């Protein structure tokens, strides 16, 4: 696949693009949707300078910071998530690298969440090959490490971690036979070509991502992008085009509509589902920011006749 071919897919007439994406989607997944829950297990004081992130220690935001949560409180959240219908429990920690003193505790938490009958996913920053192997042994199913944006636009967003470092972590994850969860953020001021290049980078990863989070910028006051923009710099039609193009390029990946969904109308979310979205974060909180409410999600899923994959098991 070339950059020009990606452009040609994206620029098809919108109805034609959505119909093609829906055809591929139905062939591979049918009418199910994956419900995932996300918990911030360590919040704030991150040494990274990601310009969108309220957890960065470089910026003055109003988030409530905390060290790694105790195991029992995390397991209680995981049980609640399972009871609510989630299939996967995702745990995020605001680290550049996981500290050695916390590694064994995180591995133990992964094992115990797995024992609850949930799929496990973590995002812990960069990890080396040995750490990836140990996480796999602990029972980890997915490791999330987003590229965020194109290689070209990346230095405008992050300077404390090189783009190639992200690729290396994904390589370590793939070599440990952990499923790769990798996507990006739209609406940070990137160009259309940057979005095409992000898709090309995802196609060229060491292993094809099984899960692709598609985020839109949530401008948080105190962050550089939050002080620059009042909303994500992408309209609904561009978002739907991006999702449909992603579905065509990744026919067997779970596409997760992630950050920013709270600000989307039910009609926009419906178009996103038609274009290929088949996974959402389910719950009122998304790390430090609000998510679409459970009641709103239940209403929309019922209206559309979508069944969670937990119901289909």
Curated annotation (Swiss-Prot):
Pathway annotation from the record: Cofactor biosynthesis; biotin biosynthesis; biotin from 7,8-diaminononanoate: step 2/2
Gene Ontology MF terms in the entry: 2 iron, 2 sulfur cluster binding; 4 iron, 4 sulfur cluster binding; biotin synthase activity; iron ion binding
Positions bound to [2Fe-2S] cluster: 90, 121, 181, 256
Entries under Pfam families matching the protein: BATS, Radical_SAM
Disulphide bonds in the chain: none
Keywords: 2Fe-2S, 4Fe-4S, Biotin biosynthesis, Iron, Iron-sulfur, Metal-binding, S-adenosyl-L-methionine, Transferase
Binding site for [4Fe-4S] cluster: 46, 50, 53
Cofactor: [4Fe-4S] cluster; [2Fe-2S] cluster
Gene Ontology biological-process entries: biotin biosynthetic process
EC identifiers of the protein: 2.8.1.6
Domain Radical SAM core positions: 28-258
Cofactor note: Binds 1 [4Fe-4S] cluster. The cluster is coordinated with 3 cysteines and an exchangeable S-adenosyl-L-methionine. Binds 1 [2Fe-2S] cluster. The cluster is coordinated with 3 cysteines and 1 arginine.
Subunit structure: Homodimer.
Purpose: Catalyzes the conversion of dethiobiotin (DTB) to biotin by the insertion of a sulfur atom into dethiobiotin via a radical-based mechanism.
Record-stated family: Belongs to the radical SAM superfamily. Biotin synthase family.
Official protein name in the record: Biotin synthase
Originating gene: bioB
